[in-house]
From Swiss-Prot:
It comes from the Bacteria. Mg(2+) binds at residues 78, 120-121, 443. It comes from Clostridium novyi (strain NT). Gene3D superfamilies: IlvD/EDD C-terminal domain-like. It catalyses: (2R)-2,3-dihydroxy-3-methylbutanoate = 3-methyl-2-oxobutanoate + H2O; (2R,3R)-2,3-dihydroxy-3-methylpentanoate = (S)-3-methyl-2-oxopentanoate + H2O. Its cofactor is [2Fe-2S] cluster; Mg(2+). The keyword Metal-binding applies. Keywords: 2Fe-2S, Amino-acid biosynthesis, Branched-chain amino acid biosynthesis, Iron, Iron-sulfur, Lyase, Magnesium, Metal-binding. The keyword Magnesium applies. One of its GO terms (molecular function) is 2 iron, 2 sulfur cluster binding. GO terms for biological process: isoleucine biosynthetic process; L-valine biosynthetic process. Functions in the biosynthesis of branched-chain amino acids. Catalyzes the dehydration of (2R,3R)-2,3-dihydroxy-3-methylpentanoate (2,3-dihydroxy-3-methylvalerate) into 2-oxo-3-methylpentanoate (2-oxo-3-methylvalerate) and of (2R)-2,3-dihydroxy-3-methylbutanoate (2,3-dihydroxyisovalerate) into 2-oxo-3-methylbutanoate (2-oxoisovalerate), the penultimate precursor to L-isoleucine and L-valine, respectively. This is Dihydroxy-acid dehydratase.
Length: 554
């Protein structure tokens, strides 16, 4: 065991003394030391309750013969950091989380890890750190919040407070209407109620095999959530005894299973970044081509918010992620023999699962669409690729040709949208928002939600080298690579250019001649980094790679 390096032998008497200072006993130090990574804080609704989840994990570990030791992790709320300079930090924090887990685990010689997180960048950051270390590990989420209810209808943070901002600006909502919506959009703790990035990643963790069945959908307030956490504490001890490490589970086939699930449920476009980043740490080669190939053959069979009216609690009641995976397995669309943290194969985990509501989980022969939720676009505007959540695009906007309205930053675009300077048919271009250029690759939820609130989602597209919240819907193409700050074609767009978007044929094109683009490229000057000297973001901008490879650090 790794922990023997700090607990055994005469030379480790000082180390044991430090443990005894905290109340650990000699008997505790003879057991495997299990690091419980707790990302609880009092600023993220999805993490506010995690101390309760961690206590359940600890009980499970102790009951199975281990010594649980809690260590902290940071966590940023994408919602609260949205639409201001703070949004430069969430994606960049993913790497901080991975690095801090590496540092804490190696410094203290933990034998295994239970990773307790919930929200957007915390999930991949934790899995990246554990994959890098290649120790036995299990991921446990805090679970989704329940949707709100107002005037007999279910609402959530996106189909509620965010989209209400645009509706208020349009004069559709009164002050009282807006106040009621913001009071009712988030009624409980937990990750936001729809299939946004947090719940997408928590669900994909089941398909990857790194979390127990139910991890993605059991609501945060339910007792079953604490039961799952306790079982995870027991299971980590089994993994230690069987010497099953995370990379034994995180194979190429496991990632393909996760992508297949992603396509079937219509997960967040951010999953492309995060799965590639986790794969990078697990030494698995994963590319945008893997997403595109799998998307073309996996039907889209659930339509949760923001694309539809169902929420995570509805998916849970319909059979959960296990039921979706069972549908895919029965059609030979996933690899069923993959090892999971239960110590069993994926097939053994899900073989008895049933779809309990086929209006929430449709059969494969009656999908919402024959292709998966995410499409990868290419063309002269995105030679290295771009990403769109096609499952959340209205059919009439799968093809669009429009005039470019160019903005060098989110704030300028948002102001133009709110001041009604964007018109039907336009293509809003928000650039210099990529991993290097921002730096940090901000999410554009506020502009996209404002477009919807103004009723423009069936006539106006938005493209960016930034990214989108999992709550974004509509014809929004992100992750355009190369990014503007690297001299990508998006930097060469001029006001009034024509842009053609053809999602069905996976194309995005700037309708400008190659000769004109070459001339513009010669005159392009790379802007300086916007991050102040001495900051983490300045260092991040020097090391981060393209969104087309997961925005990992070199």
């Amino acid at each position: 065991m790794n922990s023997k390096e700090v607990t055994k032998g005469v030379a480790r008497a000082p180390h044991r003394s430090l443990f005894y200072a905290m109340g650990y006993t000699p008997e505790d130090l003879k057991k495997p030391l299990i690091g419980i990574v707790n990302s609880h804080n009092e600023i993220i609704p999805g993490h506010f309750h995690l101390n309760e989840i961690v206590q359940a994990v600890k009980l499970g570990v102790a009951s199975a013969g281990g010594t649980p030791i809690e260590i902290p992790s940071i966590g940023i709320c994408d919602g609260i950091s949205m639409n201001h300079s703070g949004m430069k930090y969430p994606l960049a924090s993913r790497e901080l989380i991975a690095d801090s887990i590496e540092a804490m685990t190696i410094a203290h010689k933990f034998d295994a890890l239970v990773l307790v997180g919930n929200c957007d960048k915390i999930v991949p950051g934790m899995l990246m750190g554990a994959a890098r270390l290649n120790v036995p590990a299990i991921y446990v989420s805090g679970g989704p919040m329940l949707p709100g209810k107002l005037k007999g209808k279910k609402i959530d943070l996106v189909h509620g407070a965010f989209e209400a901002v645009g509706s208020y600006a349009e004069g559709i909502l009164s002050d009282d209407d807006l106040n009621k919506i913001e009071q009712h959009s988030c009624p409980t703790c937990g990750s936001c109620a729809g299939l946004f990035t947090a719940n997408s990643m928590n669900s994909l963790a089941e398909a990857l095999g790194v979390a127990l069945p139910g991890n993605g959908t059991i609501p945060a307030p339910y007792g079953r959530r604490k039961q799952l956490a306790k079982y995870a504490g027991v299971k980590i001890m089994e993994l230690v005894k069987k010497k099953i490490k995370l990379r034994d589970i995180l194979t190429k086939e496991a990632f393909k299973n996760a992508i297949a699930l992603d396509m079937a449920i219509g997960g967040s476009s951010n999953t492309t970044l995060h799965l590639m980043a986790i794969a990078h740490e697990a030494k698995v080669y994963l590319t945008l081509e893997d997403f595109d190939e799998i998307s073309r053959r996996i039907p889209h069979i659930t339509k949760l918010s923001p694309a539809g009216t169902h929420h995570m609690v509805d998916l849970d009641e319909a059979g959960g992620i296990s039921a979706v995976l069972k549908e895919l397995m029965d059609a030979n669309l996933i690899f069923k023999d993959q090892l999971t943290v239960t110590g069993k194969t994926l097939e053994e985990n899900i073989k008895n699962s049933l779809v309990l509501n086929d209006s929430v989980i449709r059969p494969l022969n009656n999908p919402y669409s024959n292709e998966g939720g995410i499409a990868i676009l290419r063309g002269n505007l995105a030679p290295d690729g771009a990403v769109v959540k096609q499952s959340a695009v209205e059919p009439e906007m799968l093809y669009h040709k429009g005039v470019a309205r160019v903005f060098d930053g989110e704030e300028l675009a948002f102001d133009a949208i709110m001041n009604k300077k964007i018109h039907p048919g336009d293509v809003v271009v928000i650039r210099y928002e990529g991993p290097k250029g921002c730096p940090g690759m901000r999410e554009m939820l506020s502009p996209t939600a404002a477009i919807i609130g103004l009723g423009l989602e069936k006539s106006t597209a938005l493209i960016t080298d930034g990214r989108f919240s999992g709550g974004t819907r509509g014809p929004c193409i992100g992750h355009i690579s190369p990014e503007a700050s690297e001299g990508g074609p998006i930097a060469l767009i001029e006001e009034g250019d024509l842009i053609e978007i053809d999602i069905s044929n996976r194309r995005i094109s700037l309708l400008v001649s190659p000769e004109e683009l070459s001339k513009r490229k010669e005159n392009w000057i790379q802007p300086p980094c916007k991050a102040p000297d001495g900051t983490y973001l300045k260092r991040y901008s020097k090391l981060v790679t393209s969104a087309s490879t997961g925005a990992v650090l070199e």
